[in-house]
Amino acid sequence: MSDFAFFALETLIKCIIIIAIFASLAGLATYAERKVLAYFQRRIGPDMVGPFGLIQLVADMIKLFTKEDIIPSNSQKFIFAIAPLISAICAFVSLAAIPMLPEFTLFGRVIQPIVADINVALLFVIGTSGLCFYAVFLGGLASNNKWSILGAARGLVSIISYESVGALALIAIIMLVGSFSLVDINNYQSDGFFSWLIFKQPLAFVLFIIALFIETNRTPLCLTENDAEIVAGYGTEYSGLRWGMFFIGEYTSMIAGAILVTLLFLGGFNSFWIIPGWIMMIVKSSFIFFWYFWARAAFPQLRPDQVMKMCYLILIPLAVLNLLITALTVLL
């Protein structure tokens, strides 16, 4: 087999595996979230369908896929129909430049668990994952429903504001490493536990985590939907498989965000003592993913004015200060 044919086949297989695994993980994440929230609230959670309630996921999928797909008569039908698809596609595309695990050898060839190892991988991931929100905005706007439009508008304001916070935090990382490549950032932290960037950039870590909660529409910083204020927000008019596409896109973005935090701040897939790198990657990413559930159970939803004041009066000044300190450190 020629090198080009092997490369094309390898890339196709990687894409299929990523879509299959992350779509499945997005479904399993709902079961995990319900169990974790039940534990925090001293409940049992799903436990009736199958062992430990695991088959509940299959039952929910059957219910979701058999629901009627309703398109409101007064909506912008084409945009309303494609918005969920845009959300899922952008979430999966963002995974293309993320190195998942250490490289390994297969059939005498070195395989890198990444679809596209590009020099501007960090910029690519942030850009494509940010596009997921435009699907949310388009879906809310096209619904022609006051709750949907209000949720989309609130979300648009928050994402524009907090992307500045996340970007400033990432610029500090780029200044230290000197590269946009996620592989280079991972390798920068290969000298042991104290080479992890969380110790060199603790403030950037906190800022990026907060921005990530906004990016993935998670409590307590989610403004796009709130049962007590705007019902389901942008998703009020969605049902069936189209709502499921939004759901898959959101949870895929959450998983991608957890992996990205691990690569940027927690040593990535580098080995730790006698623990292989791939195990460390899974453990650290799972721990960060658990934070989504922990925060939802522990903190109340913030009001929109509180979220925006925190951004402009606290987080952006801190991000700029961190950037200045990092610049001085690099120069000196």
Swiss-Prot record:
- Family designation: Belongs to the complex I subunit 1 family.
* Membrane-spanning residues: 4-24, 44-64, 78-98, 120-140, 165-185, 194-214, 255-275, 279-299, 312-332
The GO molecular function terms of this record are: NADH dehydrogenase activity; oxidoreductase activity, acting on NAD(P)H, quinone or similar compound as acceptor; quinone binding
Give the matching PROSITE patterns: COMPLEX1_ND1_1
Spell out the GO cellular component terms annotated for this protein, sorted alphabetically and separated by semicolons.
Answer: plasma membrane
* Protein name, entry field: NADH-quinone oxidoreductase subunit H
Quaternary structure, per UniProt, is: NDH-1 is composed of 14 different subunits. Subunits NuoA, H, J, K, L, M, N constitute the membrane sector of the complex.
Describe the reaction catalysed, as an equation.
a quinone + NADH + 5 H(+)(in) = a quinol + NAD(+) + 4 H(+)(out)
**Per the UniProt entry, what are the Gene Ontology biological process annotations, in alphabetical order?**
aerobic respiration
Reported EC number(s) for this entry are 7.1.1.-
What is the membrane topology here?
Multi-pass membrane protein
Query: Where is the protein situated, by its record's location annotation?
Result: Cell inner membrane
Q: Which keywords label this protein?
A: Cell inner membrane, Cell membrane, Membrane, NAD, Quinone, Translocase, Transmembrane, Transmembrane helix, Ubiquinone
Q: Which InterPro entries match?
A: NADH_UbQ_OxRdtase_su1/FPO, NADH_UbQ_OxRdtase_su1_CS
One Pfam family per UniProt: NADHdh
The job of this chain, per UniProt, is described as: NDH-1 shuttles electrons from NADH, via FMN and iron-sulfur (Fe-S) centers, to quinones in the respiratory chain. The immediate electron acceptor for the enzyme in this species is believed to be ubiquinone. Couples the redox reaction to proton translocation (for every two electrons transferred, four hydrogen ions are translocated across the cytoplasmic membrane), and thus conserves the redox energy in a proton gradient. This subunit may bind ubiquinone.
Gene this chain is encoded by: nuoH
Keyword Magnesium included in the entry's annotation: no
